[in-house]
Amino acid sequence: MLNSVLRQLIFVIFGFTFLMNVNADDSFFDDDIAFDESEGDFDEWSDDSDIFGEEAAIEEKRLPWLDLGVTQKWGFNPASYYSTTQERTEMNLGTSGSVSDSGYGEVELKATKYWPSDSNYSTEKSDLEVEQAFLQFSFDDWSTKIGKYTIGWGELEGGAIDVVNPSGGLTDPSMIPQWFLSATRYFDHSDLSFFYNTNPKVSKSSLLILKNDTYDEFGMRYGISSEGSDMALYLGQLVPNDALINLTDGMVYATPYQLIGFGMNKAFDDFLLKFDIALKNNVQHNRTGQFIKVDRLDWDLAFDIQNDDRQWLISINSQYLLDYANDYLTPSILGVGVGAKRNNMSYMVSVSDSFGDSDWKWGLSNVISSNNDLNLSSATLDWDINDQWQASLSGTYIDAKDNRAYAALDDYQRVNLEIKYQY
């Protein structure tokens, strides 16, 4: 534990010492791996109702350096008389701005209060964490960045190559920031970037013990841009975002694997074609009485279709085991082994659109995962009330096959409501 803390301290001191001694220009966010900024201000509400009328709107921020957001979340289970499964209050407090003449920085803190009816209340009543914090400097043809943020690899979010940042889970796919040191070198029509993570985040059940130590994670991306098309080559040693249970000893492990990948996109008249492919070496896998390492080929193909405000996304994903035997196993959610298939196919279709002068937005999606072992359908309705207020209503339903990895999620139903104020 002490060694881990010392490594992180040395990592931060080295990074800040290096960054504070460079001469930078003002192009802070040209980097492909720069943090994806959160949504900006919402369009002004055009309704005449005085519930959120002109008095509620602030024409000019009194504290322009302060970003404040308060979100109230509720979750209900329709299958159990709409019992409350989620009731929490989240507060985000952040600031951003220039650091001398050479850089830019952002800091955001997130505090969460779990109420007694929330499913997390029994284990955690409140939480405070650094949601994101980074410094970025640019000088000549170089850009460097250190802090806690997200790195997006590949063309498709959550696809074969987008494996650096873990997601919040099956029903919450948003990426979780991690602590990185990264650098990018820009050329005329290409760029070369590197990242290093001394303590990758690994998701696991709180009831399970992570058996192995944490490994370092690092990677390289070389991208080439041309008119109407982009492509990139990826190399790295990565740690699985989700720990895998060893069915033999009951412990969970997250040992590194090696990745070589290629991604590209091509713009056509009516759609954007996206393609990723990655060879992954030394991926952990269960076999009857054994815990082994295998090679796997992952790929995905997606069509991003934009028609005015309506957007369609259609994708296909494959995970193909190059090494395979009939006694390979996949752990279920409950930790029981089920038969593994050589090729796992997943499909996704989503559509979204806006109406009411773009104050309202709706979305529908359907995900078929693991050769139809799981079928997830969801719907969302968002309302941008005015510059400060936003509301969102969503619903999720899961149908899962018996005696397969996701069987415990069969007939999963949730209705979620969020109300957000931002300043």
Which stretches of residues belong to each language-model region?
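N-terminal periplasmic/intermembrane-space "pro-region" immediately following the signal or transit peptide
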Residues: 22-84, 94, 122
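Hydrophobic, lipid-facing positions within transmembrane beta-strands of outer-membrane proteins
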Residues: 87-93, 128-133, 177-181, 216-220, ...
